[in-house]
């Protein structure tokens, strides 16, 4: 067994121990692809996987609107409640951070592994919630801009 498979198995174990289904499923799929000699598709996943994942996530977030569970009058209430206005501002800031995270992750794949391990450790040992490496990368990019290179 090669080192990459061993590392993936360790990540799979951490995902299972940490009760992180997203990481567990993703790593299991990658391991399965390696076992079935489907590595030729890895460049395609590297190039388009993040964008495809964001599209699927966005569809999931917008489904309540499309299904009618969120009615149009709710949008007017956003501008009459300071909690909702703050939610809009925080949403904008997090989207900004995610954009910075996307750039950082594409420029330095090693950071992705560190963020993934940190997320798994946070879920496993601190009862955290996996908010995703993308936002973590955005926060890291935000912090790094203030530190010497």
From Swiss-Prot:
Superkingdom of source: Bacteria
GO cellular component, one term: plasma membrane
Keywords assigned: Cell membrane, Membrane, Transmembrane, Transmembrane helix
Residues making up the signal peptide according to the UniProt record: none
UniProt keyword DNA repair, yes or no: no
Subcellular location: Cell membrane
InterPro entries, A to Z: UPF0756_TM
Family, as annotated: Belongs to the UPF0756 family.
Natural source organism: Brevibacillus brevis (strain 47 / JCM 6285 / NBRC 100599)
Bilayer-crossing regions: 3-23, 48-68, 85-105, 106-126, 128-148
Membrane topology: Multi-pass membrane protein
One Pfam match: DUF441
HAMAP family from the UniProt entry: UPF0756 (MF_01874)
Entry protein name: UPF0756 membrane protein BBR47_32760
């Amino acid at each position: 067994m090669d080192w990459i498979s061993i590392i993936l198995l360790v990540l799979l174990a951490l995902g299972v121990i940490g009760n992180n289904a997203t990481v567990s499923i993703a790593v299991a799929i990658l391991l399965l692809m390696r076992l079935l000699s489907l590595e030729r598709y890895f460049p395609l996943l590297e190039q388009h996987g993040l964008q495809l994942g964001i599209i699927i996530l966005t569809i999931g977030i917008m489904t309540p609107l499309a299904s009618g569970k969120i009615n149009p009058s709710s949008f007017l209430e956003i501008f009459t409640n300071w909690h909702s206005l703050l939610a809009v501002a925080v949403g904008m800031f997090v989207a900004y951070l995610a954009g910075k995270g996307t750039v950082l992750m594409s420029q330095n794949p090693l950071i992705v592994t560190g963020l993934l391990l940190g997320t798994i450790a946070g879920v496993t040992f601190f009862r955290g919630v996996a908010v995703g490496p993308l936002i973590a990368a955005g926060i890291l990019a935000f912090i790094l801009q203030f530190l010497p290179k």
